[in-house]
Protein backbone atom coordinates (compact mmCIF):
# COMPACT_ATOMS: atom_id res chain seq x y z
CA UNK A 1 0.00 0.00 0.00
CA UNK A 2 1.31 3.46 -0.95
CA UNK A 3 0.27 6.87 0.37
CA UNK A 4 0.77 10.20 -1.42
CA UNK A 5 1.91 13.47 0.10
CA UNK A 6 -0.66 15.07 2.41
CA UNK A 7 -2.67 11.83 2.84
CA UNK A 8 -5.12 12.14 5.77
CA UNK A 9 -6.79 9.29 7.62
CA UNK A 10 -9.24 9.47 10.54
CA UNK A 11 -10.01 6.96 13.30
CA UNK A 12 -11.24 3.40 12.67
CA UNK A 13 -10.41 3.37 8.95
CA UNK A 14 -9.63 -0.06 7.48
CA UNK A 15 -7.33 -0.28 4.44
CA UNK A 16 -6.87 -3.53 2.50
CA UNK A 17 -3.71 -4.81 0.86
CA UNK A 18 -2.05 -3.35 -2.23
CA UNK A 19 -3.91 0.00 -2.29
CA UNK A 20 -2.63 3.28 -3.72
CA UNK A 21 -3.62 6.75 -2.55
CA UNK A 22 -2.73 9.97 -4.35
CA UNK A 23 -1.81 13.36 -2.94
CA UNK A 24 -4.09 15.03 -0.38
CA UNK A 25 -6.59 12.17 -0.20
CA UNK A 26 -8.94 12.27 2.81
CA UNK A 27 -10.36 9.11 4.41
CA UNK A 28 -13.00 9.96 7.01
CA UNK A 29 -13.94 8.02 10.13
CA UNK A 30 -14.76 4.32 9.76
CA UNK A 31 -14.25 4.19 5.99
CA UNK A 32 -13.39 0.72 4.69
CA UNK A 33 -11.14 0.40 1.65
CA UNK A 34 -10.93 -3.02 -0.04
CA UNK A 35 -7.83 -4.61 -1.54
CA UNK A 36 -6.25 -3.21 -4.71
CA UNK A 37 -8.17 0.09 -4.53
CA UNK A 38 -6.78 3.19 -6.27
CA UNK A 39 -7.75 6.65 -5.02
CA UNK A 40 -6.39 9.59 -7.03
CA UNK A 41 -5.30 13.06 -5.91
CA UNK A 42 -7.65 15.27 -3.86
CA UNK A 43 -10.40 12.65 -3.55
CA UNK A 44 -12.44 12.56 -0.33
CA UNK A 45 -14.21 9.55 1.17
CA UNK A 46 -16.97 10.20 3.70
CA UNK A 47 -17.51 8.56 7.08
CA UNK A 48 -18.49 4.91 6.97
CA UNK A 49 -18.22 4.50 3.22
CA UNK A 50 -17.25 1.08 1.86
CA UNK A 51 -15.12 0.48 -1.22
CA UNK A 52 -15.06 -3.19 -2.14
CA UNK A 53 -11.98 -4.67 -3.81
CA UNK A 54 -10.40 -3.16 -6.91
CA UNK A 55 -12.40 0.10 -6.90
CA UNK A 56 -10.98 3.19 -8.61
CA UNK A 57 -11.71 6.75 -7.44
CA UNK A 58 -10.77 9.59 -9.80
CA UNK A 59 -9.05 12.84 -8.92
CA UNK A 60 -11.22 15.28 -6.99
CA UNK A 61 -14.08 12.80 -6.55
CA UNK A 62 -16.22 12.83 -3.40
CA UNK A 63 -17.78 9.70 -1.90
CA UNK A 64 -20.57 10.55 0.58
CA UNK A 65 -20.93 9.08 4.03
CA UNK A 66 -22.25 5.53 4.18
CA UNK A 67 -21.98 4.97 0.43
CA UNK A 68 -21.08 1.48 -0.80
CA UNK A 69 -19.19 0.73 -4.02
CA UNK A 70 -19.40 -2.79 -5.46
CA UNK A 71 -16.21 -4.64 -6.44
CA UNK A 72 -14.36 -3.17 -9.40
CA UNK A 73 -16.47 0.00 -9.68
CA UNK A 74 -14.77 3.16 -11.00
CA UNK A 75 -15.80 6.69 -10.06
CA UNK A 76 -14.57 9.31 -12.53
CA UNK A 77 -12.72 12.54 -11.79
CA UNK A 78 -14.79 15.25 -10.05
CA UNK A 79 -17.74 12.88 -9.67
CA UNK A 80 -19.88 12.86 -6.52
CA UNK A 81 -21.51 9.84 -4.90
CA UNK A 82 -24.37 10.82 -2.58
CA UNK A 83 -24.55 9.71 1.04
CA UNK A 84 -25.83 6.17 1.42
CA UNK A 85 -25.73 5.41 -2.31
CA UNK A 86 -25.12 1.86 -3.51
CA UNK A 87 -22.95 2.05 -6.63
CA UNK A 88 -23.02 -1.08 -8.81
CA UNK A 89 -21.92 0.51 -12.12
CA UNK A 90 -19.10 2.87 -13.08
CA UNK A 91 -19.75 6.58 -12.52
CA UNK A 92 -18.63 8.85 -15.40
CA UNK A 93 -16.43 11.87 -14.66
CA UNK A 94 -18.31 14.97 -13.48
CA UNK A 95 -21.53 13.16 -12.54
CA UNK A 96 -23.53 13.24 -9.32
CA UNK A 97 -25.11 9.88 -8.46
CA UNK A 98 -27.45 8.93 -5.61
CA UNK A 99 -29.82 6.19 -4.54
CA UNK A 100 -29.97 2.40 -4.35
CA UNK A 101 -28.95 1.44 -6.92
CA UNK A 102 -27.16 4.71 -7.67
CA UNK A 103 -28.42 6.65 -10.67
CA UNK A 104 -27.14 9.80 -12.34
CA UNK A 105 -28.83 12.88 -10.88
CA UNK A 106 -26.72 15.53 -12.59
CA UNK A 107 -23.94 15.66 -15.19
CA UNK A 108 -21.25 18.16 -16.16
CA UNK A 109 -19.91 18.93 -12.68
CA UNK A 110 -16.52 20.55 -12.37
CA UNK A 111 -16.11 19.79 -8.67
CA UNK A 112 -17.84 19.42 -5.32
CA UNK A 113 -18.92 23.08 -5.09
CA UNK A 114 -20.73 22.78 -8.43
CA UNK A 115 -23.45 20.36 -7.20
CA UNK A 116 -26.24 22.86 -6.54
CA UNK A 117 -28.75 20.30 -5.22
Language-model region placement:
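Terminal amphipathic alpha-helical/low-complexity segments used for targeting or macromolecular assembly
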Residues: 100-117
